[in-house]
Amino acid sequence: EYLWQGGEIWQGQSPLLFPIVGRLREDTYVLSGKNYRLEKHGFARKLPFFPEKMGREEMTLILRDNALTREKYPFPFELRAHYALREDGFLMQFRVKNTGDIRMYFSIGAHPAFRCQMGDRVVMDRTENADAFRLDKDALRGQETEAVFRNSRDIEITKEIFEKDALIFDGIASGGATLMRRNGRHVHVDFGKAPCLG
């Protein structure tokens, strides 16, 4: 079992975060003089996607804007989530299309939750020198950083790492990371050139 199956601590397994990743101050933003409320990680994870293409080993699901989304996010859009089984893994790809005429602001993120145990390790593809931002008391990205990678590639999973919630990195050099289980099994995640990693 590689993915977290949900439980008391966290019900999610692998939500798609859109049109924001993280939280806004007071869950509110202003656009063209109007206030909009948008909850943590946006609304896509809580809405039904509809099949666009279905195959034996892959599928594409689509979410289009509707009256409910426009109350929180006044942009017309199409969000496609493509999933495919591969011989050596599983592929997730997301595409966002602005179907309107005005500039559309958004962020998107994958949030797969892998089952791990204390003592497992996360090993980056490349040697890193990176500090991590932590969440502040309002669950917003704080300004303070802490040293995580110093000419190193790996982090041990400990309770202390999660005391302040997520580690948030900007500008990681690696394009992927591997969760190395103590039992020898592993999961590799390729995140390409994602500008932020949490």
Task: Map each language-model feature to its residues.
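Short, well-ordered beta-strand segments enriched in hydrophobic/aromatic residues
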Residues: 1, 83, 90-98
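Beta-strand-rich N-terminal accessory domains
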Residues: 1-31, 35-38, 174-195
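Residues that act as N-cap/strand-start positions at coil-to-secondary-structure junctions
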Residues: 23, 43-45, 75-77, 108, ...
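Extended, loop-rich substrate-binding clefts of extracytoplasmic carbohydrate-active enzymes
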Residues: 34-87
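Hydrophobic residues positioned within well-ordered beta-strands of beta-sheet architectures
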Residues: 59-61, 79-81, 92, 108-110, ...
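Beta-strand elements of well-folded, non-transmembrane domains
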Residues: 65-67, 85-87, 98-100, 112-116
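Short, hydrophobic/aromatic beta-strand segments
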Residues: 102-108
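Active-site/ligand-binding surface loops and adjacent short beta/alpha elements
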Residues: 105, 113-194
